[in-house]
């Protein structure tokens, strides 16, 4: 029996490869399945997300630069990590609206401190009312401006060497190497440094001529260079995780 036009069209469609999600490098989640990422969020993250973090996430979602924010699953991860290592004195470079900062502040004891640095105070002030309402603003020492001069000033005082339990970097990728040179002196032996975006939207494993958003392509080589350098640094143990946009944890051992 001859097939109908409808059947022929159906067979043709079935033979064609299905559209692959996230073909363009630049998607926020590294997971190839949106459904799987949504499952993680709805099953494990959102039900346990503190109300202040949910409120700040909703505020940030309306901001035009919202792609810069820490993902909810990574916020949960940071909060758990700080509790596991009993962090008390920390550094955060790159704040944006403060979602990761709030996750950290909620994890620290009441007398814990976070030295937070960002070049844009206006973005930080979007989330500040939520941070204040959560009762953790007293833990945060916010400095507006480039982080390197602040770190250099800290290093000048020997008392600051090895005085921090944890540092989180989510800022200009072309300066990650410069941040590491300084943080390795400021974080104690046994302390941890977390570098965000080290898988950089998956671009680190993509061909150089793959379709990418301009900002992804611009920073791709900087991220790849940093990843190679940190993998060869004998002063730290490292673990690179595909959480959020990729986070590399460095535990200082010497």
Curated annotation (Swiss-Prot):
The keyword Protein biosynthesis does not apply. Residues 7-25 have a biased composition (Basic and acidic residues). Its EC number is 2.1.1.104. S-adenosyl-L-methionine binds at residues 70, 92, 94-95, 100, 118, 147, 172. This is Caffeoyl-CoA O-methyltransferase. The keyword Aminoacyl-tRNA synthetase does not apply. Its cofactor is a divalent metal cation. Keywords: Lignin biosynthesis, Metal-binding, Methyltransferase, S-adenosyl-L-methionine, Stress response, Transferase. Belongs to the class I-like SAM-binding methyltransferase superfamily. Cation-dependent O-methyltransferase family. CCoAMT subfamily. A divalent metal cation binds at residues 170, 196-197. GO terms for molecular function: caffeoyl-CoA O-methyltransferase activity; metal ion binding. Induction: By salt stress. Substrate binds at residues 28, 170, 201. Binds 1 divalent metal cation per subunit. It catalyses: (E)-caffeoyl-CoA + S-adenosyl-L-methionine = (E)-feruloyl-CoA + S-adenosyl-L-homocysteine + H(+). Residues 1-25 are annotated as: Disordered. Pathway: Aromatic compound metabolism; phenylpropanoid biosynthesis. GO terms for biological process: lignin biosynthetic process; methylation. Methylates caffeoyl-CoA to feruloyl-CoA and 5-hydroxyferuloyl-CoA to sinapoyl-CoA. Plays a role in the synthesis of feruloylated polysaccharides. Involved in the reinforcement of the plant cell wall. Also involved in the responding to wounding or pathogen challenge by the increased formation of cell wall-bound ferulic acid polymers. It comes from the Eukaryota. InterPro entries: Cation-dep_OMT, SAM-dependent_MTases_sf, SAM_O-MeTrfase.
């Amino acid at each position: 029996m001859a097939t109908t036009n409808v059947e022929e069209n159906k067979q043709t469609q079935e033979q064609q490869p299905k559209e692959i999600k996230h073909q363009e490098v630049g998607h926020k989640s590294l997971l190839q399945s949106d459904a799987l990422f949504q499952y993680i969020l709805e099953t494990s993250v959102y039900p346990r997300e503190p109300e202040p973090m949910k409120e700040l996430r909703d505020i940030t979602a309306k901001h035009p630069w919202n792609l810069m924010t820490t993902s909810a699953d990574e916020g949960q991860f940071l909060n758990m990590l700080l509790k596991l290592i009993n962090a008390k004195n920390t550094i955060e470079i790159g704040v944006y609206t403060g979602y990761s900062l709030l996750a950290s502040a909620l994890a620290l004891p009441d007398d814990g401190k976070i030295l937070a640095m960002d070049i844009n105070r206006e973005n930080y002030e979007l989330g500040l009312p939520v941070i204040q309402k959560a009762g953790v603003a007293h833990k945060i020492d916010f400095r507006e401006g480039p982080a390197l001069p602040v770190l250099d000033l800290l290093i000048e005082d020997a008392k600051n060497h090895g005085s921090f339990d944890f540092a989180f970097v989510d800022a200009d990728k072309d300066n990650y190497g410069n941040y590491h040179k300084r943080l390795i002196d400021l974080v104690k032996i046994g302390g941890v440094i977390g570098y965000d975006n080290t898988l950089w939207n998956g671009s680190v494993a993509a061909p150089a001529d793959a379709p990418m958003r301009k900002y992804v392509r611009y920073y791709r080589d900087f991220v790849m260079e940093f990843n190679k350098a940190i993998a060869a640094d004998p002063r730290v143990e490292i673990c690179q995780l595909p959480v959020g946009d990729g986070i590399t944890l460095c535990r200082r051992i010497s």
